[in-house]
């Protein structure tokens, strides 16, 4: 849909890619619900621009059907783009509480991408991950478990720890504290990951320890 709520075909979207654009990134609203459209538009955009850089990138909760996910990853692999998994939580019950669904498929899909595709192009990174540090829910134990899971495939997979900002149903929570973020950073490094960083550092607070 456009800003006027008019449906746009994959062909129209592909034609709208400006000649100066070097990356198409699907995020901020998971692309899973409209993957067939996004995949087709991406294929057409690459076909229309064969002699210049045009990377296809994705940020996803990892819940897509494996058949569609493989198509997503292939587009990123071939174009020089990447796919980022938002690994919300390790504990399944916590994941259901926060997201309303199990994380089983997300973890299975991450493992599939890491084993089937990552060896084809370790650099620049094809597969990256992130976790939102929700105060009172996602602590260093959760991050440690997630980081150990990632590290078993490749300790060089980039991992971002993101500061939480109170919004919507969680408007009563504080922003992530600096001490919370640093504990999680240390936990991820201890798990063996070598490329960990804290994102959204401007949001970090001293609201709790």
Give the predicted meaning of each segment.
Residues 3-173:
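Conserved AdoMet/S-adenosylmethionine-binding subsite of the radical SAM
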Residues 178-209:
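A cross-taxonomic marker for long C-terminal extensions/tails that follow the last structured domain
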């Amino acid at each position: 849909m456009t800003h006027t709520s008019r449906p746009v075909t994959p062909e129209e979207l592909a034609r709208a890619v400006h000649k100066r654009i070097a990356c198409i990134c699907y995020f901020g609203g998971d692309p899973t619900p409209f993957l067939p459209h996004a995949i087709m538009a991406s294929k057409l955009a690459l076909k229309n621009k064969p002699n210049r850089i045009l990377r296809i990138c994705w940020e996803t909760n990892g819940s897509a059907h494996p058949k569609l996910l493989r198509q997503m990853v292939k587009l990123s692999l071939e174009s020089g783009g990447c796919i980022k998994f938002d690994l919300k939580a390790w504990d399944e019950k916590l994941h259901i509480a926060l997201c309303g669904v199990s994380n089983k498929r997300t973890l299975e899909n991450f493992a599939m991408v890491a084993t089937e595709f990552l060896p084809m192009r370790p650099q620049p990174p094809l597969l990256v991950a992130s976790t939102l540090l929700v105060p009172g829910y996602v602590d260093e134990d959760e991050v440690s478990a997630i980081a150990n899971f990632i590290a078993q495939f490749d300790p060089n997979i980039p991992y971002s720890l993101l500061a939480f900002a109170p919004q919507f149903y969680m408007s009563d929570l504080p922003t992530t504290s600096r001490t919370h973020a640093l504990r999680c950073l240390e936990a991820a490094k201890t798990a063996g990951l070598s490329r960990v960083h804290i994102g959204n550092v401007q949001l970090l607070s001293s609201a709790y320890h």
